[in-house]
A protein has these predicted regions:
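Hydrophobic structural segments
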Residues: 1-94
């Protein structure tokens, strides 16, 4: 398992399943004879969009707090580019 990388991503609750489906389809989450392996926990993220940002949630200049999941999974090094591309396509944030 030395060729495995760990991916950690924060996802709004509304897009949790879509993001996981995308990264799993691209090759993440396989450990031995198991697939779709991940660890997740619900928390609260916060941010303030600065001028020039196009926030998915909230408005520029306002502090936002949103329910987000921290998702951790593993992926083979060879799948890194595909998993990152799938993550960017499925994730709603800029």
């Amino acid at each position: 398992m030395s060729d495995l990388l760990k991916l950690t991503v924060y996802v709004p609750a509304s897009h949790l399943d879509a993001v996981k489906d995308a990264i799993f389809a691209a090759g993440a989450g396989r450990v031995g004879d198991y697939d779709r392996c991940a660890w997740q926990v619900l928390g609260e993220g916060q941010f303030r969009a600065l001028p020039g940002a196009q926030p998915f949630i909230g408005t520029v200049g306002a502090l936002e707090q949103v329910a987000e999941y921290r998702v951790e999974t593993v992926l083979p090094r060879a799948a890194l580019a595909a998993v990152v591309a799938a993550l960017k396509m499925a994730h709603p944030y800029e």
